[in-house]
Amino acid sequence: MKKQRNLRSMAAQAIEQVVEQGQSLSNILPPLQQKVSDKDKALLQELCFGVLRTLSQLEWLINKLMARPMTGKQRTVHYLIMVGLYQLLYTRIPPHAALAETVEGAVAIKRPQLKGLINGVLRQFQRQQDELLAEFNASDARYLHPSWLLKRLQKAYPEQWQSIVEANNQRPPMWLRVNRTHHSRDSWLALLDEAGMKGFPHADYPDAVQLETPAPVHALPGFEEGWVTVQDASAQGCMTWLAPQNGEHILDLCAAPGGKTTHILEVAPEAQVLAVDIDEQRLSRVYDNLKRLGMKATVKQGDGRYPSQWCGEQQFDRILLDAPCSATGVIRRHPDIKWLRRDRDIPELAQLQSEILDAIWSHLKSGGTLVYATCSVLPEENSLQIKAFLQRTADAELCETGTPEQPGKQNLPGAEEGDGFFYAKLIKK
């Protein structure tokens, strides 16, 4: 049976679920994409990601174009108009087609009586586009970030906040990790070249390759065979600091979806790895990654604050703690983060990180290494978190990453084309 649905209305409903109900786009989008034809999957993703990336602008424009906001059962129409505006501003879809499909979306969401309103608002925008955009570009909304986050970035990075914001608003590059147990990076790059694609090696991370143009994973040489994995370069940097060795007992805590678990096993295939995550659903992706790469690890569901519940008194040679965080370093990859996070989340996350660090430290052997990592750019979750931990933990010593006054290494979004990421390497005396 042919799959045929109104993509604009589907995108509007997905965006509404993110903004109004706090649902993650990575949970909402895949089931929706199963309902449309293969050729429409990419457009549905573009509409959802694009609207969430530029939501501040689209909201600002609607407030200028409409006397009253849409509320109640008509709220989905508000997001449908956003989808229409996004197409007119940012896509190559011919304006007449963008308008027609968006207006028709009102029928799909059972609001056919509002077709005229949607058409009128979008046509009004076309007439006033130049003057509206000039006014918008002089407003604070042009940064496309919620005000609470903008204030935190300005405080933490008085010289760099604008470049962080600009990087967050870009489309991310596609980074891959070559499985060194199958191929050297150079030999896999040669296979990529034979397949008619270009890739570039990262200067610092030995397995990392950036694709010149993002591609579907099934087009990548050996993806199904486990020769290559999609993983941002900054996330791959964790292995530089962890430096896992064969024969060691290694804990990957907060492990889902398993990208770092499998990287540990690529670097040290004879290591004994325990992968733990609190989210049982996301652990299924750890199993999937291990299966595709043909690797074995022990996988458990567990809360990082209570390690004795899932590992007893076990001690580890190395621990990778990829701590739960605000994810403010990966906004370009997950633009819904801007609208899912709240200012009050930051102290709550910092408290959780602190509790996990304290709990897991007793399970690290003397002389062992713990790498604390986040995909955040906020000091409360990163340098300040580690500074406080070092002050209260007599047998913890910072190694290779920063100074006791400014602990850790902070990668900012877009630096060397990678995501925003923080690492601190700690040794137990």
UniProtKB/Swiss-Prot annotation:
Keyword Cell wall biogenesis/degradation assigned to the entry: answer is no
According to its UniProt entry, one GO biological process term is: regulation of DNA-templated transcription
Tell me the compartments it is located in: Cytoplasm
Annotated SUPFAM superfamilies: NusB-like, S-adenosyl-L-methionine-dependent methyltransferases
Q: What is the protein's given name? A: Ribosomal RNA small subunit methyltransferase B
The entry's active site is 375 (nucleophile)
**Domain of life where this protein originates:** Bacteria
Q: Which gene encodes it?
A: rsmB
Could you name the Gene Ontology cellular component terms for this entry?
Answer: cytosol
Q: Which InterPro entries match?
A: MeTrfase_RsmB-F_NOP2_cat, MeTrfase_RsmB-F_NOP2_dom, NusB-like_sf, NusB_RsmB_TIM44, RCMT, rRNA_ssu_MeTfrase_B, rRNA_ssu_MeTfrase_B_ent, RsmB-like_ferredoxin
The catalytic activity, as recorded, is: cytidine(967) in 16S rRNA + S-adenosyl-L-methionine = 5-methylcytidine(967) in 16S rRNA + S-adenosyl-L-homocysteine + H(+)
What EC number(s) does the entry state?
A: 2.1.1.176
Under PROSITE patterns, the record lists: NOL1_NOP2_SUN, SAM_MT_RSMB_NOP
* Annotated binding of S-adenosyl-L-methionine, by residue: 254-260, 277, 303, 322
A molecular function GO annotation: rRNA (cytosine-C5-)-methyltransferase activity
Biological role? Specifically methylates the cytosine at position 967 (m5C967) of 16S rRNA.
The protein's predominant localisation is cytoplasm
